[in-house]
């Protein structure tokens, strides 16, 4: 574990913010979006990300140019097991390590996003720096149903922020999900011609974007590829990110038909969003946040596991008219064709969905979380001085 240098001159240094959101992309990406917003608001801010060796943060945080401190992971067992017996020891170890980090960077505020590192971060902040003051906490909940770590953290947090009003946490301020600026600042109309040329689509094409997260989604892959002939016959082009470990069973390409562009992974989601008129995707919190932030209507297919939070994530935009919900069990080639073709061939309906999707987004979420963090940190520092 790296050690930050301790600065005892509390009033003369920049604000020190610790971001606790390691594990999955759904925890790391919002934290990095807030980090970027913090730096834009206060160039002197010191930003430290807290993570574990097993999380995506070991790659994503250094890529974004931020400091990363590693602690022991504290996975919370969903069912009674031997891991549950070892949990108290793991929590104590992680809290001790986290307190060392908070002391080392002289933290002014902890912003937690849930996940493996959030619980020890909340508990360490509540216990205070080694021999010194407590550290105020800001909690952000991205999902429609709050996890255990954030439910614990929210009890003593100075501010509780959420993507939706009914996440199960009390006294929340709804700010949306923080999304990186390269997405929130995207002008789809201005970039459309370049984006479509990049993927080989005609400038006036009707484009369906298909993706299932970084690893793809097998049920979505099967259903959309099964609808390939019907989509082509309707004049619809497809950009399909199927996942690096997956392949698609596509019919032989017809040189006269609109292109079906299949790729393992999309490095430039901004170009993909700009090229598309409609998306088929899962409804994880980050996916819904990005798709609505750019005003792209979507057919959401919630992942059929967990506690149903993916369905809940999509409901606000669906209820607003910016998307549709299709259950994974109902997904088939016929379902895709019957749903997609009427949308992409009806200009007025597509325009209405696009407008509704745009109004459902929260493109300023990262900035709002960053502003709250700085406000809490400055108030705490003023009180301590």
UniProtKB/Swiss-Prot annotation:
Gene Ontology cellular-component terms listed: plasma membrane
Membrane topology summary: Peripheral membrane protein
EC number: 2.4.1.227
Broad class of the protein's primary localization: membrane
An example molecular function term from Gene Ontology annotations: undecaprenyldiphospho-muramoylpentapeptide beta-N-acetylglucosaminyltransferase activity
Record's catalysed reaction(s): di-trans,octa-cis-undecaprenyl diphospho-N-acetyl-alpha-D-muramoyl-L-alanyl-D-glutamyl-meso-2,6-diaminopimeloyl-D-alanyl-D-alanine + UDP-N-acetyl-alpha-D-glucosamine = di-trans,octa-cis-undecaprenyl diphospho-[N-acetyl-alpha-D-glucosaminyl-(1->4)]-N-acetyl-alpha-D-muramoyl-L-alanyl-D-glutamyl-meso-2,6-diaminopimeloyl-D-alanyl-D-alanine + UDP + H(+)
Positions bound to UDP-N-acetyl-alpha-D-glucosamine: 24-26, 143, 180, 214, 310
Catalytic EC class: transferase
GO BP field: carbohydrate metabolic process; cell division; cell wall organization; lipid glycosylation; peptidoglycan biosynthetic process; regulation of cell shape
InterPro entries reported in the protein's UniProt record: GlcNAc_MurG, Glyco_trans_28_C, GlycoTrans_28_N
Subcellular location(s) of the protein: Cell membrane
Family annotation (Pfam families): Glyco_tran_28_C, Glyco_transf_28
Sorted UniProt keywords: Cell cycle, Cell division, Cell membrane, Cell shape, Cell wall biogenesis/degradation, Glycosyltransferase, Membrane, Peptidoglycan synthesis, Transferase
Metabolic or biological pathway: Cell wall biogenesis; peptidoglycan biosynthesis
Gene3D superfamilies: Glycogen Phosphorylase B
Reported function: Cell wall formation. Catalyzes the transfer of a GlcNAc subunit on undecaprenyl-pyrophosphoryl-MurNAc-pentapeptide (lipid intermediate I) to form undecaprenyl-pyrophosphoryl-MurNAc-(pentapeptide)GlcNAc (lipid intermediate II).
Family, per entry: Belongs to the glycosyltransferase 28 family. MurG subfamily.
HAMAP family from the UniProt entry: MurG
NCBIfam families: murG
Protein name: UDP-N-acetylglucosamine--N-acetylmuramyl-(pentapeptide) pyrophosphoryl-undecaprenol N-acetylglucosamine transferase
UniProt organism field: Mycolicibacterium smegmatis (strain ATCC 700084 / mc(2)155) (Mycobacterium smegmatis)
